[in-house]
Amino acid sequence: MTPAAVLSAASGVALVLLSLALLLTVLRIIRGPTLPDRVLGLDMLVAIAIGLIAVIAVRTGFYLYIDIAIALGLVGFLATVAFARFILARGLSPERRTPGTTEIPQAKPRPSQAGRRKRKGAR
């Protein structure tokens, strides 16, 4: 077998496996019982898309796709951080609260500024 044939076969198998993973991840996003499950599914979807783009770049020889995959990775990371902050700001969902309580746990207050030394030039 020539190296080109091996590369073609390997990229074909990789595309099939990544496509299957993409379908299963979309299923997880649709069926996910909680919002964190869906956010994790979206993060996984971005990772699979990066893999697909990389395999297509190797298969076609058009390596500009790698730059697109890097940009997608950065956007995916920022989206995951934003979703995580959104989930934290919402508090615990009703099904995850401690049974018998109706209150949402509050963040601890910050320690007082007493005892801290002021920086030079600060008011």
UniProtKB/Swiss-Prot annotation:
It comes from the Bacteria. InterPro entries: MrpF/PhaF-like. GO terms for molecular function: sodium:proton antiporter activity. Signal peptide: none annotated. GO terms for cellular component: plasma membrane. The keyword Transmembrane helix applies. The keyword Transmembrane helix applies. Its main location: membrane. The chain crosses the membrane at residues 4-24, 38-58, 64-84. Keywords: Cell membrane, Membrane, Transmembrane, Transmembrane helix, Transport. It is found in: Cell membrane. Residues 95-123 are annotated as: Disordered. It is a multi-pass membrane protein. Belongs to the CPA3 antiporters (TC 2.A.63) subunit F family. This is PhaF2 protein. It comes from Rhizobium meliloti (strain 1021). The lineage of its organism: Bacteria, Pseudomonadati, Pseudomonadota, Alphaproteobacteria, Hyphomicrobiales.
